[in-house]
C-alpha cells in the first residue's frame, strides 16, 4: 500500500491518494488494486508546503485531486474491500512499502478500519 498526502502531519494534512498491491510470499504481484485519487478542499490543499505543491504539480496529482469526486470514505471502503478479497484473515499479512511508519500514522488518523486489517509487522522498501 502506498499513500500520498498533503504533508507529514496527520493533525493538519490529509490523504490524497491510495494505491494497493497484493503480493505473495516472494513479493510477486498477485493483484493490483485501484489507484484512488481523493478529492480534497482548496482549504486542505492550501496547507501544503511549497515542496509538496511542486511535487504534486509535477506528477499531475494536484490537478487529479481537484478534479476527483471520490471522498476519502469511499476510497477507504474500496481499498478495504479489495484487501478483504485477497487477504485470508485480518492481521495476517505485513504492510510493505516505503515510508510505512508515516502511512500508518495517516491510516490510524483517517482510515482505522484499513489499519485494523494489517499485521503489526512490516517490510520497508527504499
Can you annotate each of these PLM segments?
Residues 96-101:
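Short, well-ordered beta-to-alpha junction loops that form the rim of enzyme active sites
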Residues 119-125:
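Conserved small/polar residues in nucleotide/adenosyl-binding loops
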Residues 1, 5-95:
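Conserved non-catalytic scaffold segment of RNase H-like nuclease domains
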Amino acid at each position: 500500500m502506498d499513500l500520498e498526502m498533503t504533508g507529514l502531519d496527520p493533525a493538519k494534512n490529509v490523504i490524497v491518494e491510495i494505491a494497493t498491491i497484493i503480493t505473495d510470499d516472494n513479493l510477486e504481484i498477485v493483484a493490483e488494486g485501484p489507484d484512488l485519487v481523493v478529492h480534497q478542499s482548496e482549504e486542505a490543499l492550501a496547507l501544503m508546503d511549497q515542496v509538496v505543491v511542486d511535487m504534486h504539480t509535477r506528477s499531475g496529482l494536484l490537478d487529479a485531486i481537484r478534479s476527483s469526486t471520490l471522498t476519502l470514505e469511499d476510497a477507504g471502503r474500496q481499498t478495504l474491500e479489495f484487501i478483504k478479497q485477497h487477504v485470508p484473515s485480518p492481521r495476517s499479512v505485513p504492510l510493505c512499502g516505503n515510508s510505512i511508519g508515516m502511512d500508518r500514522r495517516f491510516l490510524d488518523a483517517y482510515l482505522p478500519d484499513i489499519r485494523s486489517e494489517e499485521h503489526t509487522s512490516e517490510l520497508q522498501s527504499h
